[in-house]
C-alpha cells in the first residue's frame, strides 16, 4: 500500500533582509501526508466462544472485503522571531479527512449472521495550534514566557454513502446513525454531527416543557419513551490554553505552568449514584431544606423518592451534566544551582522541588475533567467512580561531571 507524504519549508529571512521590519527569523512550511490504520485483529474469520462447555455460534460475519482506514492530511504554518529572537511566534493550520472506517450493520437474516462489517464513513478534522513567547535577560535576572493555544473541530461528513450495497448479497446498506447506549447515556454518530456528541435521558415534562410532578406521589417520573434522549453537548474542549513561565536569578530558578481547558461537557454517574443512596452533599442539603428544588419556584418535598428516580444508576442523567471547563496549576518547579566552586569547579550540582497537578483555579464539575472512563469514541466525558486525580510532589538532585 502506498502512503505518500511531502513537506516543503522556506526560511524567508535567509532570502531577504527583514531586519528593518524587526524580523530576525521567518520560516513558512507546508506538508501533505496520507497514513493508514489497520482493521481490528481476528475479524476476517468466524469467532466462537466457549462458555461452560457450550460453544456459541458466531454472530458477526467474517470480514471478507476490507480496506485499510486512510487519513489524508494537510498542514501549513509559519515560525517568526522578532527583536533578536526575544519575541517568537508560531502558527499552524491543519485539515484532515479520514475515510474507510469500520462499521457494523444489521445483516440480512439470509446471511446467517446478525451483523456484518463494512468500510465507510468520512470524518473531517481541522484546527489551529499557535504559540507566542518572550525571553530576555537583565543582568542576573532572566524571564522566559510562552503562551500556547489550540483548537480542534470535527464533523461527520458521511456515514455510509447512499446506494451502498452488501458485497455478498447485493442488498442496500442503509445506516442513518450509529448509537451506543450506556443506561441513560447515548453517543450518537450522525451525518452533520460531531464525534463526541452525546445525549442523556431526562425526566418527564408537561406540554410546556416543565418537569412533571405526579400529583399522587408528589415526585418526578422518568420519561417512559425509550427514545426520549436530550442533546447534552459535546465532550471535546472548544479551546485549550497553556501559559509557561521560567524565572531565574543568581542560580535560583522558578517554573510555573498553568493550563486551561475551555468548553466541553460531561456527565457524572458517580454523583447520580451518591444521590441515589443519600451519601452526597446534595442529598444532605435536600433533607435539611425540606426537599429538592427542581426549578426556581418548584420544590419536590420527598428527596428520597426524587433521588431514587433521578439518580437511579445511569437511568436519568440530564441533572448530572457538567461543564468540563477547568483551569489548573499543572506544574511548579523551584530549583537551585549550587556554586561550582564548592566542588572545585569539577562538578555542577542542582537541586529542585517539583509539584504537578497541584490545584485548580476553576472547576465546576464534581470530578476532574481530565480523568475519563475511556479514550474510545463512545465513552468519553463519563465519570463513573473514577480514580481520583493525583497530586504529585517530588525532589530531584542533578549532578554533572
Tell where the protein language model's regions lie, with residue ranges.
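Conserved SET/PR-domain catalytic core that frames the SAM/AdoMet-binding pocket
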Residues: 146, 156, 227, 237-251, ...
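Glycine-rich, aromatic-lined ligand/substrate-binding cores of catalytic
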Residues: 232-268
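Short, flexible active-site loops
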Residues: 226-228, 239-240, 252, 312-320
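A short beta-strand motif that forms part of the nucleic acid-binding face
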Residues: 46, 93-95, 259-262, 271-272
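Conserved small-residue
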Residues: 118, 137-235, 283, 295, ...
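Extracytoplasmic gating/loop element in the C-terminal half of outer-membrane beta-barrel translocons
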Residues: 261-350, 354-356
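Active-site-adjacent bridging/hinge elements
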Residues: 52-54, 103-106, 217-223, 302-311, ...
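Extracellular/periplasmic, surface-exposed regions of secreted and cell-surface proteins
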Residues: 1-181, 316, 321-401
